[in-house]
Amino acid sequence: MDVGYEQFLAPELFFNPEILNPEYTTPLANLVDQTIMHCPVDTRRGLYSNIVVAGGSTKFKGFDKRLQRDLNRLVKSRYEANIKAVKEKLAGNVEVQGKQMEVCVNGSKKREIASWLGGSYVASQVYVDRMD
């Protein structure tokens, strides 16, 4: 079997889902970003700096780097927009400084079974009731 561009199409669906279906228009990076932005403000920096990818589909070559790059673009864009808005509000008379979020995406070598390992660990803990 000869596989051409199709080999690149599968992982691209995570980043451009509209390729498969026009109804799916939110890329994975945007979903991760939206999820973190719904968390309490004081936890966001820690969440952005410790994003862990799991599952067999994340083993595509460059997946974690691509996700990190796309998230960095979103975070940087929002940071610059916020700085600009603050400067405009203060009439540009004040130097505005802020610390941009650090985005770090990691994946273990055994990420295809990481979800199972995590679930198995939690289930083995004494405090987990069988009815939970």
Model-derived segments and their meaning:
Residues 1-132:
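C-terminal region/appendage detector
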